[in-house]
């Protein structure tokens, strides 16, 4: 029975998988995202940035798994970044940064890139790995100053790419989404299904081995 390991501490990604019938093992990577990004060239594309980060996370998680889990499992890690006018926006980390991001985003459209990396382990060996990036266009609304400050004060925006959520309070300020909504939350179900299939794993098998109880 192949266990699915979510290499992420993201509550949003965990929620997406559980709502889709899979209760994964959770193992946060601890990768220093700033350090990895600093090692990339300034001309690195958004797709390559998130793909590199997703692979770094998945690789670290896979290497730290117990022998019992690594005997038969698949690791998936993701990374998301919002791009507006070629500038990437990650997690704001502070209210001041989140406010600045929203001032740049309000009333505009941005592209959310989410890198996905899947590593298949069998008998404690990597038998397959693949990474790919999905992109979704998001049209942001124009929250009033009062609404924006209330949203920033709740803290939700600080630890999510772009400083917003679709499935939380930030959903009030998203006017439209063009593409896969689950990608906006942090893990794209269509792309994940495709990557698992390439690793020889069906969604039916994942449901059976990782049931939500």
Curated annotation (Swiss-Prot):
CDD domains hit by this protein: Maf
EC number: 3.6.1.9
Catalytic activity, reaction form: a ribonucleoside 5'-triphosphate + H2O = a ribonucleoside 5'-phosphate + diphosphate + H(+); a 2'-deoxyribonucleoside 5'-triphosphate + H2O = a 2'-deoxyribonucleoside 5'-phosphate + diphosphate + H(+)
GO CC, alphabetical: cytoplasm
GO molecular function: nucleoside triphosphate diphosphatase activity
Keyword Lipid biosynthesis listed: no
InterPro entries recorded: ITPase-like_fam, Maf-like
Family under the similarity heading: Belongs to the Maf family.
PANTHER family: BIFUNCTIONAL DTTP/UTP PYROPHOSPHATASE/METHYLTRANSFERASE PROTEIN-RELATED, BIFUNCTIONAL DTTP_UTP PYROPHOSPHATASE_METHYLTRANSFERASE PROTEIN-RELATED
Protein name stated in the entry: Nucleoside triphosphate pyrophosphatase
Originating species: Mycobacterium leprae (strain TN)
Lineage per the UniProt record: Bacteria, Bacillati, Actinomycetota, Actinomycetes, Mycobacteriales
């Amino acid at each position: 029975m192949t266990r699915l390991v979510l290499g992420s501490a993201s509550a949003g990604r965990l929620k997406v998988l559980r709502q889709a019938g899979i209760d994964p093992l959770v193992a946060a990577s601890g990768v220093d995202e700033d350090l990895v990004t600093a090692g990339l060239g300034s001309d690195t594309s958004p797709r390559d940035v998130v793909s590199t980060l997703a692979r770094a996370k998945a690789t670290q998680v896979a290497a730290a798994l117990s022998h019992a889990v690594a005997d038969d499992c698949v690791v998936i890690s993701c990374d998301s970044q919002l791009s507006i006018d070629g500038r990437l926006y990650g997690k704001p980390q502070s209210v001041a940064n989140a406010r600045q991001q929203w001032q740049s985003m309000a009333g505009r459209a941005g592209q959310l890139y989410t890198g996905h990396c899947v590593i298949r382990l069998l008998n404690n060996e990597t038998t397959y790995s693949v990474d790919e990036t999905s992109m979704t266009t998001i049209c942001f609304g124009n929250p009033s100053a009062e609404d924006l400050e209330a949203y920033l004060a709740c803290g939700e925006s600080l630890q999510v790419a772009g400083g917003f959520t679709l499935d939380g309070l930030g959903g009030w300020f998203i006017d439209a989404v063009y593409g896969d909504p689950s990608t906006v939350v942090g893990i794209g179900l269509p792309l994940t299904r495709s990557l698992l299939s390439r690793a020889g794993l069906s969604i039916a098998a994942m449901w059976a081995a990782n049931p939500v109880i």
